[in-house]
Swiss-Prot record:
Pfam families: UPF0270
InterPro entries: UPF0270, YehU-like_sf
Cystines in this chain: none
Protein name: UPF0270 protein PFLU_4323
Species for this entry: Pseudomonas fluorescens (strain SBW25)
Domain of life, per lineage: Bacteria
Matches recorded under HAMAP family: UPF0270
Protein family membership: Belongs to the UPF0270 family.
């Protein structure tokens, strides 16, 4: 299920993005400040380049690049 980023409260969206950008394996040795990484993800969401995907079975959200989202979720 796709969740519109603007359906989330600002603080909730920020926490979701921060969780995503601070996960192991997401920095790839990049020393970019947290605020910059959060801003980049927020911009990707507003441009439609990234989407929030909710899995009802696991009850978890994840951020994905649009081209990585399973096609059936767009139906």
């Amino acid at each position: 299920m796709l969740i519109p980023y603007d359906a989330l409260e600002v603080d909730t969206l920020t926490r979701l993005i921060e969780d995503f950008v601070t996960r192991d394996g997401t920095d790839n040795g990049d020393d970019t400040p947290l605020e910059t990484r959060v801003l980049r993800v927020r911009q990707a969401l507003t441009k439609g380049q990234a989407l929030i995907v909710f899995d009802p079975d696991s009850e978890q959200c994840q951020l994905m690049l649009k081209h990585d989202v399973p096609k059936h979720l767009f139906d």
